[in-house]
């Protein structure tokens, strides 16, 4: 014993008088970790080994005699086993050969002894009565290996057991284990009744039968046949009269001939354990502890022999001590030993097709044979006996299982043994009966259907089907064997035999099968797999359904995360390639696109755009926002034209003002005419001529900067007709205004100056009119000026698909002179003719709907909006909602400043009473009450906030084309502005113009932009942020001027947009650092070199300009510059001078340069600072 209180294996072997390997075998069966004779084990583990080896010795002897009858057969195959232990019991001689296998069986027996410790199914236990009495202890069943058929059944089920026997226990005669049986009083019974030898739990063990192993069934088939021989001896005592006659008749033939296993030969080489006897030891894992309550849902085994001593207590279904294994009934047709009256597990239904053993009175047959659980290794049941009669039991009392050849069995191949180790628990629900299985339990004994021929078991990965047993045998359980709940139950009830479970090698060769057992721990998975592999193939009918789930699992399992990523990448690539078609044109919304959005629009990879920008000197990311020039440059590289969305989208009519309910009340309404064209082409002058007013003369700078709405009444065919004119700005900054004017118009008048022709804003106006789908009437203005050519204008317009009527087109073109009033009447007549064709109608009897043309904040009136009513009638006091702004009309005035009480369709009015300045371009609608209007406004307000936030983010974006090195280094300067204008349209125009200013080194940030006067709050904000306040056509509120003076805030007021933009650009340039530039002074030529001490002086002649002392010089020698630095001394006739002019000679010296040579050219210059300009 070691100092820590542990015992070494070699010390224990000395105490027991055994060899080291015998003790190691016993430790292995008990799942005790012991690698060599010097390994240490605890006292409790040593006690277990002592009890196992001590008890096993005695039983083996009695078992040997029992085995005597069978020795002949087993001896041949099991000669390997040593007969040493067999002699222990008299009469064992003949069985000795068989005993060798039993030696392995003995280990098996030991495992049963440990069932509590290890879930070792008691292999065939020889002890009948004794076992029975001792059956209460699981250990005894372990000894059961000696027992014949019953024992076999028990041992067979344990696949793990089979693995355990990997190393033969020949050194230890089975006699050792058998002694355990002998120890039990039932030992004598064993001879008389080999089957009873199985411990009561052993009876449960028979459930092992479920495992389809032909060889294994007889006696721990997985175990070497040696164990069987032992069983054979008990078989010798034919005393098993209880068995049905059919069983008796069939018994001998099976012993002589292996059961017909259609799919594979009776001995399954794969299933044969490496060591014959050991398998039985492993089987004990399956052994259920005596007295253990049957597992819920498991039907009692039919025909399983029960210990005589335990009849009172229903034999509990063997619990899966180790790996769960389906229990099998005692061998089919194997009669119960006489005298074993232990009833079958109580409550367990008789297994259909399994004959009840005569010896078991009152044992209910198990109706749900399908629900059998694999307690140990499943054993193949063959319906046919040697005699060919299926269901014929082996010799009465023969321990061998029905259908198994008598005598010693050939050891199962290690590979198959591993497979057998997979435990399978079956759900209580009956599985579908196999076609070959008899429907009734009684049929089993009488008429047995011949077993269905099955193909040979496939390779390890394939789940072998179940081989049918004798007619009386259990039917093959179906998929229910793999029920998760049953497995989990088995895991809970099984004894700690985890080390033993490690034996499964299945994982080495079969990954696919390992995948099938998902949801179980590694060891349990391997066990389950091994059990499934041990089964023979199913009949074809069932095979179709069985593989399906496996295939599905495999399919899912095959795809790894990397494979899935590759597949998705390929799908995305294919999708991109499919839509790799370049668009004919892209429309850029609101001059704002990210790299990724542009890539999607161009149907190219974002990396291509990033690469293109990189070669242009711009570092970009996929989320970088691009400005319009950059978008156009990138799109041009890919040959895709770009169109700004606001050019067309803003001009589209999105809301239909006429509803279905208005159709019965429509009347003719006046047309709305929008006057558009390039700046200074005479739009407002033309309107003045039509209105006979002088509006243009009163406009700042002579240009229109907001929309004007006017109504003109003219005579046409002796009838007064009204026309509503909208005058739009022509400056490039007022694109949004022009778009809004076109959106509400019925006819567009395109004004083109005859002396200027088609200009950029002319083209934009054309695109607006086309987007709004309104007819165009061209007014060729200024025909009275010199150099005017109407035909040239028509030619240029024809290039824009506007062909004059006189040239065969459909566009009305009228030459006019706004100053002289020429052809004005003709133009109006053409407008009325065009609008008559349009059939313009509206319903004046409904609440008004229309569009906000312009809006501003008046310091006296508050928010004021110019509304164009497109349908219905607007009255004073109406509650209306204009976008997210709520208003109640307090007053209305027309273009002549006359107050109105109501205004009909196509009328333009200025309305007062809004809660805030509405947004120009929003539609308005009158609601019956304020509550309904507020509900609508609430929803719109939340949307407006989100839109505003997006716009603010967009205004802060950095243009890629404007990004410079200084900006990357954090030296980008910012000019903060606060913008206040008279109307909303002017604010939009100025913001749009500021976006076009170059931002290489100075970024413009608009902190606040709104219509209205400049307030003290604006001044405070400007003072806090260092901003400049820009006012456009607005004034300052009281107190604002004083606050601005006090805080030193710069407030600028403008009335012409040109001047405003010019000053802002100058302010941006003022933030730039001045740059140093060279200013040339003159040149001189070296004609002589004088050495003075260590330095040298050059005698020079000034050719051009002047030389200044301390100026910068470059010395050129040929094509090279040999020196650049300061000119330190300048002398003339030995006098220091400040400068030498052209045509004079002088001496030049530089402290850092003395290598003068004749012919050198001296270039004199100085560095001066210069104000920097913004570069576009």
UniProtKB/Swiss-Prot annotation:
Residues 32-44, 57-79, 94-166, 193-235, 388-409, 439-469 have a biased composition (Low complexity). Residues 702-706 are annotated as: G2. Residues 32-502, 535-567 are annotated as: Disordered. Residues 781-784 are annotated as: G4. Residues 553-567 have a biased composition (Basic residues). Pfam families: EF-G_D2, GTP_EFTU, IF-2, IF2_N. Residues 817-819 are annotated as: G5. PROSITE patterns: G_TR_2, IF2. GO terms for molecular function: GTP binding; GTPase activity; translation initiation factor activity. GTP binds at residues 677-684, 727-731, 781-784. Belongs to the TRAFAC class translation factor GTPase superfamily. Classic translation factor GTPase family. IF-2 subfamily. One of the essential components for the initiation of protein synthesis. Protects formylmethionyl-tRNA from spontaneous hydrolysis and promotes its binding to the 30S ribosomal subunits. Also involved in the hydrolysis of GTP during the formation of the 70S ribosomal complex. This is Translation initiation factor IF-2. It comes from Synechococcus sp. (strain CC9902).
